[in-house]
Amino acid sequence: QIDKYMGYREYYSNIIGSKELAEEFVSLYSKAEQDIITLQTILLQYADKQIDKNTCIDKLLEIYKYNGHALGFYMSNQIIKAGLRDEMIKEFHNPYEFYRLYLLATNKNNDKLLSRKFLSYLKMATEQYYK
């Protein structure tokens, strides 16, 4: 989590070293909440067979810039802000659990919510890999 006295722009500038790239990360971070909703929409379209696998992957790659670091960083900060840091540390490797914790965090922070249908699909899609 970013030190509360340091802004995101300063944080990214310090760790990245390139002003342009730091600005891109700040931009990605600032639109992360909307990107999470878009990601949910894409995966539900795939789950409902409205789009094929290749289209799904192409659309997800538009969101997961730089391996999704800004998105994951945003989600982690929301989880920590909601007091769920320890749970996140235990479960961060499991995509379903990470998104479940994000949902709990958004409930606590009164932000936009993920749908149960999305979480059910994510659980089903990942349970064979994460037990």
Residue ranges and their predicted role:
Residues 1-30:
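Zinc-dependent metallopeptidase catalytic helix centered on the HExxH motif
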Residues 20-131:
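Pan-zinc metallopeptidase signature
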